[in-house]
Every structure is written in structure tokens, then in C-alpha cells.
A protein has these predicted regions:
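His/Asp/Glu-enriched, well-ordered alpha-helical/loop segment
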Residues: 2-85, 101-102
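Active-site microenvironment of metallo-dependent hydrolases
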Residues: 51-149
Length: 149
């Protein structure tokens, strides 16, 4: 309904109160299944769901000039997926295959702003930087929600 009304709709993780996982692939797969379970004839396509989890999500956040799609001048935020897993379904549509069967465990490589942070099971990050960033995020969160622990 929101899409038909022309509203910006993005998908993201971060609300485990509604779904108890932080896996965008699972979020998109659940959306596909809900649409079909409701027998919605106009269910959202896999292509639309992928866009909702990437460019549309960036638009909702107002950061589409930096992320959300691969374009010159934007951050190179990329993941590479291993489609060889036994749980991967065979389909002619790679986007549908991605959304219907991939999970975080299929991610072979993660690149953020052009830097490879994770590749083939190995993290390429400085633990001191990670701890510093976690502290920064927690202090921002605490400033925004001082009554929360």
C-alpha cells in the first residue's frame, strides 16, 4: 500500500523485537513469504525487495548520495555471496535466488567504502578501532536515551 501511494519504503534490520534476527536476507525472505501467504496477487517482486533493502533504504535515511547503489562518487559498500551452498535454490533469477535462500553465513566478502573488512571467514579490522567505534556509538545512544542502560 505504501509503495502504491508513492511513499519511500526501506527495509532494514535493527528491530529484533519484531523479528528475532539481524539478517537482511531473512527480512526480505519473510516479506516475500508474507506477501504470498496473504495471497496478494500484486506481491512485491524480488527486485523491488532488493531495492528496498539498498537504494530505497538509503533514500529513507537521506544518504542516497553516499550509499545504496554502485555509482561513481559513492562509497563502495559491497558484499559478495557464495551461491554454491547446498541450501541455495536453483533459479533463473539470481535476485530471487538471493532473497529466497541466502543468509549472512553465505557472505564471502564485505567491503565498506572500498575497504575489505571481511573475506572468506577472516576479519580485516583493527580491534582497537572497533572498540573505539562501539564506545562512540554507545555514548551517542546514551546521549539520545539517557534513561536507558
Amino acid at each position: 500500500e505504501y509503495l502504491r501511494a508513492g511513499l519511500r519504503v526501506g527495509l532494514a534490520t535493527g528491530a529484533p523485537g519484531s523479528l528475532d534476527f539481524l539478517d537482511l536476507f531473512t527480512e526480505m525472505r519473510v516479506e516475500l513469504l508474507i506477501q504470498r501467504a496473504l495471497n496478494n496477487r500484486d506481491f512485491i517482486s524480488a527486485q523491488t525487495l532488493l531495492e528496498m533493502g539498498t537504494l530505497s533504504a538509503a533514500k529513507v535515511l537521506g544518504i542516497e548520495d553516499k550509499v545504496g547503489s554502485l555509482e561513481v562518487g559513492k562509497q563502495a559498500d559491497i558484499i559478495a555471496i557464495d551461491f554454491a551452498g547446498a541450501h541455495q535454490t536453483s533459479a533463473n533469477d539470481p535476485i530471487f535466488t538471493l532473497l529466497s535462500s541466502a543468509s549472512n553465513s553465505d557472505i564471502m566478502m564485505t567491503m565498506v567504502d572500498g575497504d575489505v573488512l571481511f573475506e572468506r571467514g577472516q576479519w580485516h579490522v583493527d580491534s582497537t578501532d572497533v572498540a573505539r567505534n562501539i564506545g562512540r556509538v554507545l555514548s551517542i545512544r546514551n546521549a539520545l536515551r539517557p534513561d536507558q542502560d
